[in-house]
Swiss-Prot record:
Cofactor: Cu cation
Biological classification of the source: Eukaryota, Metazoa, Chordata, Cephalochordata, Leptocardii
Binding site for Cu cation A1: 161, 196, 200, 207
Listed Gene3D superfamilies: 1.10.287.90, Cupredoxins - blue copper proteins
Protein name: Cytochrome c oxidase subunit 2
EC code: 7.1.1.9
Annotated organism of origin: Branchiostoma floridae
Membrane topology qualifier: Multi-pass membrane protein
Keywords: Copper, Electron transport, Magnesium, Membrane, Metal-binding, Mitochondrion, Mitochondrion inner membrane, Respiratory chain, Translocase, Transmembrane, Transmembrane helix, Transport
Catalysed reactions listed for this entry: 4 Fe(II)-[cytochrome c] + O2 + 8 H(+)(in) = 4 Fe(III)-[cytochrome c] + 2 H2O + 4 H(+)(out)
Amino acid sequence: MATPAQLGLMDAASPVMEEMIYFHDHVMLVLILITCLIFYSMLVLISSKYIYRFLTDGHVIETVWTVIPAIILVVVALPSLKLLYLTDELDNPQLTIKSVGHQWYWSYEYTDYYDIEFDSYMLPLGDLSKGDARLLEVDNRVVLPVDTSVRVLVTAADVIHSWTVPSLGLKMDAVPGRLNQLALQCSRVGTFYGQCSEICGANHSFMPIVIEAVPVEVFEGWCDMMLDEE
């Protein structure tokens, strides 16, 4: 999860987020090189004692500053397109869950193998335990098995919401009357926090999302426990 005064990205907890971090570093390298080149050119021009006042055109330089930016755009665009299609790639998911946004809480359904449904509300400050995150803890967490291909169906019951978990590289709008989907695979055990990322009313800030990634055996035990409570 994010920490105070954090400047970098969260640690990746999914293959997609790892690729996003690599792409971020790739683009930042390109931007730094461009910035250094521009500042160097400015410094040379400012410090130069020679001025050619009668230069009206230059076919070579115009070709250079057209071709080089085009090449740079291709260098940035190709990894971006690859990542874009990777985020939408969903091949034979092993588990499907449905997330429904409400004002102002989330409800979840596990309908593939287990008939499990529950609502997930933010815990008030008075119910927090020592070490819990303020405004991020919920009464019912989404429990998922690690290293498992999961399909998340996202929709809303009232207004537009957005189901977002940064450390997993997930963000999908929840639109009433429309069913969106995204691919999810947790690459390590842990607890990952997110929030609604679409302004949806007075209590928009109080719609946290908590995903708990556990080993498959623990997930099966959790499912049995939830079924016993039904």
